[in-house]
């Protein structure tokens, strides 16, 4: 990892965004690692650093506006929007039953290319739901950018459907960096690598 990403990896760890221990996942599996990037919003300097790390990835991508996915990525997308002066929208998790009954909040025009911003990629399921809402509104999606790719199949499943997943960091990047620099005990790293390998 370069200096900027090493600093980001350290700050994510110290902010409690990534924890090691024993955690029950939604699927019922017991995981030795837990990634909760919602903590980022409580650390303004970290939020700014996270937004900067996305900026470096998205400068070469073609898009008209960004779409933050609810809920964790909306503040991240807002920070990116402010830093890069990109117009932003977001697809709602649930359709509004009153007022405009909108599926998508913010201004947009059919035919525009939208860059999806999310916090984490696991299998890609939630990305496909968002893509469906955006494309149903006449928007074009080519690229999805996340902070961390858990490397659990999202890149492959999105790729097969014709979408490009870009990640600031992969789980392998983080584990290798923390192991090499003695930030996390070796046995915890090994246990986590084994778990991630087996749960793919």
Where are the regions that the model predicts?
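Short, glycine/charge-rich flexible loops or terminal/linker lids adjacent to PRPP-binding catalytic cores
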Residues: 76-115, 123-128
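Active-site-facing substrate-recognition patch
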Residues: 1-58
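Conserved acidic residues
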Residues: 64, 112, 142
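Phosphate/pyrophosphate-binding loops at sites that engage ATP/ADP/AMP, CoA/4′-phosphopantetheine
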Residues: 54-64, 131-137
């Amino acid at each position: 990892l370069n200096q900027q990403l090493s600093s980001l990896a350290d700050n994510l760890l110290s902010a409690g965004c990534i924890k090691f221990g024993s955690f029950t996942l939604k699927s019922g599996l017991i995981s030795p690692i837990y990634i909760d990037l919602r903590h980022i919003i409580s650390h303004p300097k970290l939020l700014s650093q996270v937004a900067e790390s996305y900026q470096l990835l998205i400068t070469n991508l073609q898009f008209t506006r960004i779409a933050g996915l609810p809920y964790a990525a909306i503040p991240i997308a807002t920070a990116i929007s402010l830093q890069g002066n990109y117009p932003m929208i977001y697809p709602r998790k649930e359709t509004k039953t009153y007022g405009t009954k909108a599926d998508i909040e913010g201004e947009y025009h059919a035919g525009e290319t939208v860059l999806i911003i999310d916090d984490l990629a696991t299998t890609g399921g939630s990305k496909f739901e968002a893509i469906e809402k955006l494309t149903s509104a006449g928007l074009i999606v080519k690229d999805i950018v996340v902070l961390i790719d858990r490397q659990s199949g999202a890149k492959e499943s999105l790729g097969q459907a014709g979408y490009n997943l870009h990640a600031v960091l992969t789980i392998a990047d983080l584990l290798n960096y923390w192991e090499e620099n003695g930030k996390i005990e070796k046995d915890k790293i090994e246990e986590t690598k084994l778990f991630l390998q087996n749960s793919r």
